Swiss-Prot record:
GO terms for molecular function: ATP binding; DNA binding; zinc ion binding. Belongs to the NrdR family. Negatively regulates transcription of bacterial ribonucleotide reductase nrd genes and operons by binding to NrdR-boxes. Residues 46-136 form the ATP-cone domain. The lineage of its organism: Bacteria, Bacillati, Actinomycetota, Actinomycetes, Mycobacteriales. Keywords: ATP-binding, DNA-binding, Metal-binding, Nucleotide-binding, Repressor, Transcription, Transcription regulation, Zinc, Zinc-finger. A zinc finger (unnamed) spans 3-34. This is Transcriptional repressor NrdR. GO terms for biological process: negative regulation of DNA-templated transcription. Signal peptide: none annotated. Pfam families: ATP-cone, Zn_ribbon_NrdR. It comes from the Bacteria. Binds 1 zinc ion. Its cofactor is Zn(2+).
Amino acid sequence: MLCPSCRCEDSRVVDSRVVEGGIAIRRRRECLQCLTRFTTMERSVLLVTKRNGVTEEFSREKVIKGVKQACQGRDVSDDDLKLLAHEVEQSVRADYGSQVNAHDIGLAILPPLRRLDEVAYLRFASVYKSFSSSEDFEAEIALLRRQHQGNAPSSGS
């Protein structure tokens, strides 16, 4: 690591911590030449393979941008979207390792978005799952209702 003060390449690690839910490592370093302390963040690269075969780095910003359109006019904050993108990244890393198909990212977005806002979920799902009729919406709404009934507290008799 280059020291930001003197550009020396020699430094020692003073402290290391896992951050961002295990996605990154924060290292506190000290330059061996000028003794300046500085912080570095190390993150493993998550590669996304798109439909056309092109591979690029995972982008939380792209997740946020895609979901933000579905959340337009809804009571969803930027912090909510950042949290969702973080959750999607963690889920994808846990399930697929260091490389994932773009389609699988879309699938990973659906559960946390459904928990965040069901209307935004339906909007996103309608595009992602290529809804072509009102019946597609009705089927998805029926699925949501069944899930609500399955999660409803039972009346203890």
